[in-house]
C-alpha cells in the first residue's frame, strides 16, 4: 500500500510540475503569427559586454516598415505613467493603460468580442477595453461608442472590446489606445523623430520566421547610416523567446527563466522514476 501511495504521489507531483512547465513553454504561442513576430532591441555590448535594452525610440517602428519590404507590419507598445480614467462618478487609476499603433491588433491575436481589429485603433482618440475593464466602467451596458475621460484632459471613444488578456502573455494591458495619444498629450511632438528617446517596445512582423537574421543585419547597418556616432546596434528577438530566454534590461515584469523550466522538468522525471523504483522494489 505504501509503495502504491508513493507512486501516486510521484505521479501527482509530476503532473503538477508538467502543467507549470507547459504553461511556461506556451507563453505568447497563442498568437497566430508568433513565429513571425520579433521585438527590436538595442544591443549595447560594444559599450558594456553582454548588455542589451528592450526600450527603443518612437521613430523606429515606422523606419523598418518604410525602408524594408520584408517588414509587413510594425508597432510601438508602451505607456508613460498611470492614468486616471473617469466615466460619470467613477474615477479609477489605471496602471495597465497601454498604447500601440494600429498594426498591433492584427499582428497579435488578442480575440475581439466587439469591434474590428483592423480599424479599432485608427481613430487617434479611441480605446479598446478588455471584458473585465468594460464591465468595470459600464456594467452590462454595451460600451461601444461610449466615452471615457483620461486625466481630466481628453476623452477617448470605445471602439473595441477584447477577451481578457491571457495569463500566458508577455504583453499585458487593460486599456489600449493609439500611440498618437502619447505623442500629442504626454511626450510631445518633439519626440516623434527623437532617436535618443528610448522608452518603448518595438515589434515587427515578417513573412516568415527565417527572415529575422537577415533583417537584423540590415537594421544594424541602418542605424549606423542615420546615427554615425552611435556605438550600439539594433537586433531582433523572437516573440517566443521573450518570456523565458530574454536577458534585456527594462523588460516586462512577468518574465520567466528557461533554467527553472529545465530544473523543474528534471525534478518531475526524477519524482516519477523514484516512485516507480520504490513500487517495483
Q: Model segments located where?
A:
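Hydrophobic alpha-helical transmembrane segments of multipass integral membrane proteins
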Residues: 7, 11-14, 269-276
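Short amphipathic beta-strand/extended segments in non-transmembrane regions
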Residues: 38-42, 57-113, 226, 232-233, ...
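N-terminal signal-anchor/signal peptide hydrophobic helix marking the start
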Residues: 1-12, 262
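N-terminal membrane-entry
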Residues: 251-269
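Mid-to-C-terminal secondary-structure elements
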Residues: 98-114, 126-256
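Intracellular coupling helices
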Residues: 1-2, 6, 275-281
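Sec-dependent signal peptide cleavage junction
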Residues: 25-39, 45-55, 61-63, 164, ...
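Alpha-helical transmembrane segments
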Residues: 9-38, 281
